[in-house]
């Protein structure tokens, strides 16, 4: 079986890049002859070496998308299946299907709501992606893979996709990379931290909800004054706004790491006492899954796909959406109860092993491929 996987850009530190890298590696291990086509490849998906699709005239977004689609049409041939991810990859799959008759499967990760962005260009980008995907979903797709039940619901309700066309294949976790590590707490010396730690890993985009964690911090410090809050990841979008308007009283308890080497992330998960993920929208929730693989309890909001990944009262504590007081209460409860932290952490690890391995994701993806080709 020969499969062409298409995503226009493989971003560094992107959940979708992780998805493609982990999935293609395991599909290759199962005998699939797989190639990844991308216009730009900043992220690492080794051992797979992406095929960079080069073309001239890549200034305007529309020109880039059209050029990428046309060039892929000349390069993707003699494949049994084309598997696309995101926008504008979905158009490539439709084009190749029309041009060469190659069946097309599309994995839908979802788009963060327009209201979740403050940057006007990001709002326009999400509108463009959502509308484009809506029309593309009805113009030449054999199967759609949803990464969660929540995403399947979006596909049937808002994108009007026939339920019979949809298969759910959950994302996975690299269980060999993310697991409990002895001596990991030594990493806090680098940041001058000595005491309980609450960790967030991710971007600073508004919909990721860091502002709700910031609001929760004073409430936590009233009860657990020695707690440190580590914000690990990118600083794009609203960091300056957050720092000026909300951080003055709690600056002493905050540590911003910025982007980190990949090898440090598993140590951070293992070293923290509580992982907090206050995101206001998730199609799956990869970082909470990684934290649970490292046997750490999670505090998050009870909406979107998060309840599919974090079980309230068993592997973490889920608060009402946008309820910073509920977020604080969950963090405090875990910081004050070490037995609960250990129990939830171990249950989280077991659940990740049972339901969310990349090997299982690869097997289920292979089942979808076979259904299409039968």
Predicted features along the sequence, with ranges:
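Carbohydrate-associated surface elements
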Residues: 150, 172
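Membrane-proximal helix-turn-helix segments that form the acceptor-binding/catalytic region
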Residues: 125-144
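Short alpha-helical donor nucleotide-sugar binding micro-motif in glycosyltransferases
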Residues: 259-260, 267-272
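Short His-centered aromatic/hydrophobic patch
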Residues: 84-90, 108
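Conserved acidic donor-binding segment of nucleotide-sugar-dependent glycosyltransferases
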Residues: 312-313, 317-324, 333-339
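Aromatic "clamp/platform" in nucleotide-sugar-dependent glycosyltransferases that forms part
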Residues: 280
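Glycosyltransferase donor-sugar binding loop
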Residues: 40-42, 173, 201, 228-242, ...
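Nucleotide-activated donor-binding/catalytic signature segment of Leloir-type glycosyltransferases, i.e.
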Residues: 241-263
